[in-house]
Amino acid sequence: RQRLGSEAVRRVFTKTAQLWHNATPHPHWCGLTLLAIDGVFWRTPDTPENDAAFPRQTHAGNPALYPQVKMVCQMELTSHLLTAAAFGTMKNSENELAEQLIEQTGDNTLTLMDKGYYSLGLLNAWSLAGEHRHWMIPLRKGAQYEELRKLGKGDHLVKLKTSPQARKKWPGLGNEVTARLLTVTRKGKVCHLLTSMTDARRFPGGEMADLYSHRWEIELGYREIKQTMQLSRLTLRSKKPELVEQELWGVLLAYNLVRYQMIKMAEHLKGYWPNQLSFSESCGMVMRMLMTLQGASPGRIPELMRDLASMGQLVKLPTRRERAFPRVVKERP
């Protein structure tokens, strides 16, 4: 592991993520691939090397018990394939890490973000980086805007002014940003969604409001990694920073490997998406297949992989019910 380093594993993850994503016929919405970005924290062993490389977060003046790594990933939501990732220390904001994903985002995409990524500079740069690179995000509380035109019920074209600080940081940012504001009521709660999809004819407002709920898929993906793959272990294994980075790229690579096999399984099931299959059961199947391949002749490998792809019927999930309670953060005791 020490001779290999982290860069080689990063390159393998990046290359395979691109290849597998491009090889998958993802379902589209109005011609757009559905993506999401979100952050996740990883705890590292408490060693002097990790402590120096990954400064601890403090709460009320008290340092965290372990050094931590902050990561932001981008995921295709119907397959759960990770398409890009960036990580740093707790001193890096998630927006800083998200900036590294701009150039890795493909054309004809819609990226769903939570309110923590609200930055007109970041959102504007996201749109301008390619062709039809759209985004959707909850409007920041207290944000000031001017309504330009009504597009439908609870649907307006709006103009938002940018700050001098944002224009200084983002040279391509003008004095104003034009966007579309949707006001919807879900389960009695009013929600304001801001998006770059300003063409009301191409992008129906009623469908867009329901679309944002799919952002939760990336959180489910993180749960699959931490609970199933990591067996709910709270701390990574590596005691040196270089190996911590290598381990993280390896975890993402292994997750995508399982997810790509689930894509192959779903192709054999009519009307099923890969995210409607059991990750834990599929992960077990892939692990057993890897052990089988060790003793198989090269000529049998294609047949064994076809057999694995045909087993999707065994890992179908029941219809997912709605969340029974809102997401909450427990208070400290």
Residue ranges and their predicted role:
Residues 3, 7, 11-16, 24, ...:
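Single, function-defining residue in the core of a domain
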